[in-house]
């Protein structure tokens, strides 16, 4: 019986030819070990002060983070002019930078303080941000809904280009999410250069949605891949269960596929299987140890 892992290994060489073409959407230099720049998505550390966050990330052992700056994040949009510089300063004191800002932005609006958030980020040296998802409604044809997105996307890309910061879209599984299947959002992206609109590509969600065809989703996103997300999962019946990076269906074969395509951009580790929050006794140490273990796995895959 051919497993998903076997399929991944046997298709990597063939897909290398399919991927040959345009360069990365946003190339980044390699990490200190000669591998990629590795960031950490710090959602599981929300609730720490800026200094506490910087200290925890330094203990984990990465030099950059993807920082949530959205409702419920490290910094709220309403406070971004004051608090984001403080966060950047605290991180810099520990040799850490922000490689990606996670936002609630998918259109130019006062509600999300789009221009203020993006201009503040750019002024602090942040080069890219993750967009919020677009959502489907069950009450309207899908193609018509994609057409409705186009003006909002056009205005956001134009503002981002003016500011000099790159918008990135994550493929997230689920029937309501535009981009879950990749093809729909990829069709909208074709109107723009990769430097102006890119993917934060999530292999977990691609595998969940793609079944045996997920390598085609990777190939479709590859020329616009600004950052590659790493996390893992298991199926519990029909339910997706997040798990440590070493324990799920995704393995080092995916890294071989990226290497075969000459991917040299940054990668980001997501630790999404922990229960609890930083306010609970013992959680922080557990989160640091889990992050370290996943980081060691990720580095071993790239070695």
Specify the residue positions occupied by each region the protein language model found.
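Histidine-acidic metal/acid-base catalytic patches
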Residues: 2-37, 48-58, 125, 182-201, ...
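Active-site acidic/histidine proton-transfer and metal-coordination neighborhood
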Residues: 11-20, 51-54, 71, 94, ...
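Mobile, glycine- and charge-enriched loop segments
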Residues: 29-44, 88, 92, 97, ...
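Active-site beta-loop-alpha junctions enriched in small/polar residues
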Residues: 41-45, 68-72, 103-106, 134-136, ...
């Amino acid at each position: 019986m051919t497993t998903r892992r076997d399929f991944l290994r046997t298709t990597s060489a063939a897909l290398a030819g399919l991927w040959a073409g345009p360069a990365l959407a946003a190339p980044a230099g390699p990490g200190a070990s000669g591998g990629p720049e590795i960031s950490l998505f710090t959602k599981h550390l929300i609730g720490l002060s800026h200094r506490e966050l910087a200290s925890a990330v330094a203990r984990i052992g990465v030099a950059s983070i993807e920082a949530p700056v959205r409702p419920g994040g490290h910094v709220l949009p309403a406070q971004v002019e004051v608090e984001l510089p403080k966060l950047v300063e605290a991180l810099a004191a520990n040799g850490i930078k922000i490689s990606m800002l996670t936002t609630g932005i998918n259109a130019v609006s006062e509600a999300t303080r789009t221009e203020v958030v993006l201009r503040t980020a750019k002024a602090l040296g942040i080069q890219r941000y993750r967009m919020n998802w677009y959502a489907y409604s069950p009450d309207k044809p899908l193609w018509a809904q994609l057409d409705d997105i186009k003006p909002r996307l056009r205005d956001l890309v134009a503002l981002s280009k003016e500011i000099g910061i790159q918008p990135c879209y994550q493929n997230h599984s689920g029937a309501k999410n535009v981009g879950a299947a990749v093809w729909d959002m990829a069709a909208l992206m074709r109107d723009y250069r990769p430097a102006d609109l890119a993917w934060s590509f999530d292999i977990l969600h691609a595998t969940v949605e793609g079944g045996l065809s997920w390598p085609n989703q990777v190939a479709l996103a590859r020329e616009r891949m600004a950052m590659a997300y790493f996390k893992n999962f298991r199926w519990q019946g029909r339910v997706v269960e997040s798990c440590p990076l070493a324990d799920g269906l995704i393995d080092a074969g995916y890294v071989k596929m990226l290497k075969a395509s000459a991917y040299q951009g940054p990668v980001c580790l997501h630790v999404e299987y922990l229960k609890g929050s930083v306010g609970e006794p013992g959680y922080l140490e557990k989160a640091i140890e889990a992050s370290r273990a996943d980081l060691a796995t990720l580095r071993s895959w790239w070695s």
